[in-house]
Amino acid sequence: MNINQINTKLIKPITPTPQNLKNYHISFLDQHVVKKYIAVVLYYQSAPDNGRLEDSLAETLVHFYPLAGRYIKTDLTVDCSDQGAEFIEAEARGDVRVTDLIGKTDTIHLCPEQYFGLDEGVDDPLLSIQVTRFSCGGATIAVSVSHRVFDVSSLETFLSAWSSASKTGGGVAPVIPSFALASLLPNKDEKFGLDSNKCQGKEQKIAVKRLLFEKRALTRLTSERTSGVRAACAVIAKALIRLDRTTHGKSRDFVVFQPINMRGRTGVPSPKNACGNMSFGSFTRRVSAKEEVGIGELVGLIGDGVRRGIAEYTEILCPDRDGRDVIIHVRNKNIKEVFKSETFVVSFTDWSKFGFYEVDFGWGRPIWSGVGPQRPRGNQTIMMRSKEGDGIEAWVHLNEDDMDLFEQDVEIKLFLS
């Protein structure tokens, strides 16, 4: 697919950010996330160019002002001087239609250049958007945001606000985000910190495959008390464990890792529309290489791991506790357990509950939503809701050699799309 970027500009808030908001101090969680960008791609069958995208973005950035700023890593702050969000206009050459792209995982040409946070330079935009138009009248909108300041839930809040402003022309009350997490969990001297990047493996060439778990398959895999996401995760985890045994020539102990969105789950509730990072890593118990674990047991393990993670982090916003100490204690305990010997980590991220299919800029809802380019150091599977809403799409990221073997797994072949 030949994509030509025809224009790049910086979109600034329509009104200047007040002086008292110029320096946004990131939170303790923001401080210690993995350095990367989070990207989602939305596909629209019809997308007339009426100029509202840019205007509504400028209106929305008034409330989401850190996204128009620049990160100053030496100060752990965002300089909110309205430097602007990157806005790229592109066009697809030839007769490729948006509908031809549904189900395809190669999204890199539809997305802004990925900075991946390796340097986190003072000139790197925290928010980049690429609108790619097709001769059929359709378009894709790719939104890439720095994980240093936002998690996926925050990205959903931003997309809801921007699309609402575009669709209504500002005729309804805007979605107002809260940036109070930074004051509730302020950043802390680095000597007390946790470097999530040190927990990552080596960089590798990544291949991506999409698995589709349709409603009928999920019904077969689940019971009334089992979520479809966990059942799909269990199938993939079982295949990855078999793959790990093949590549290492032996069974290894393993754990399953999954971030938990703690909004609405803390003893003291987080602010409404809380933006920033509010996701915490949960781990299953360590499973011995000698244990034979089936799909049903894996479903239970994953559920237990999530419940344990929620219990461990529930008091992070309590006024009589220093939430940062809770985070340090839990994460250090988990890291010590996982890395005390050779352990295989199976990693999942659940995006299925986010409302990407509700993002209507005034042209109707997306006909599909996809995951932007990832650079995991190890395996990573992102779970997405299918367009119909009753199925699960799994975007599996593995190194290229492992992916060749993964695709040959008998169970996985049933779900390759």
Swiss-Prot record:
UniProt record, GO biological process: anthocyanin-containing compound biosynthetic process; pigmentation
Pathway stated in the Swiss-Prot or TrEMBL entry: Pigment biosynthesis; anthocyanin biosynthesis
Highest rank taxon of the organism: Eukaryota
Keyword line: Acyltransferase, Transferase
Known regulation of activity: Inhibited by the following metal ions: Cd(2+), Cu(2+), Fe(2+), Hg(2+) and Zn(2+). Activity is strongly inhibited by CoA-SH and partially inhibited by acetyl-CoA, caffeic acid and bisdemalonylsalvianin.
UniProt tissue specificity: Expressed at higher level in recently opened, fully pigmented flowers.
A molecular function GO annotation: anthocyanin 5-O-glucoside-4'''-O-malonyltransferase activity
Catalytic activity: 4'''-demalonylsalvianin + malonyl-CoA = salvianin + CoA
A Pfam family hit: Transferase
EC number: 2.3.1.214
Positions annotated as active site in the UniProt record: 147, 360
Principal EC category: transferase
Role, per record: Catalyzes the transfer of the malonyl group from malonyl-CoA to the 4'''-hydroxyl group of the 5-glucosyl moiety of anthocyanins. Anthocyanins are ubiquitous colored pigments that are responsible for petal color.
Subunit structure of this chain's protein: Monomer.
PANTHER family hit by this protein: F21J9.9, TRANSFERASE, CHLORAMPHENICOL ACETYLTRANSFERASE-LIKE DOMAIN PROTEIN
Similarity comment text for this entry: Belongs to the plant acyltransferase family.
Protein name listed in UniProt: Pelargonidin 3-O-(6-caffeoylglucoside) 5-O-(6-O-malonylglucoside) 4'''-malonyltransferase
Phylogenetic placement of the source organism: Eukaryota, Viridiplantae, Streptophyta, Embryophyta, Tracheophyta
